């Protein structure tokens, strides 16, 4: 289990580093082996807390970037068939510097974009930032084993493995979703992409979302 998160200002405001650090701390229980914030710019940052499973070397620490630093990924989960995807990419001339599935996932996305999701076998939630297009790609495994929440308003886009991490940032106001509460009392689950907070949504199982 790892923890992922990110903050992007939609109006190019500078991120308060205290808020980013508080988010990092709130996710550290999900990944005790390494925790880090990557400030892609003053107004964009990705956060990761790592539980090492594959390629225990620090070279696979996250947030992870490609050699050109155009793409940044934070990834929670495990890609079971990453060796097969790696071999396929190598046959196309793609080079690798680690032995882990994070680099395979990132370079698979660079090669195939959203089509990489059709090739993945595993449990995962991840976010990829493209510095050239200023876009963010969020995706979640088909079963929904790994959680992923996000919110957006006029000033901020924020995502995290945990709902409380977004709420505690105070960047997104809390607004109770009464219909979700009623649904939970009736069915013991919150419907669709809802969370109980009208301002925060969850990526659904098998879904991907792009923000520009």
Listing of model-derived features with the role each one plays in the protein:
Residues 1-212:
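Cysteine-centered catalytic environments shared across enzyme families
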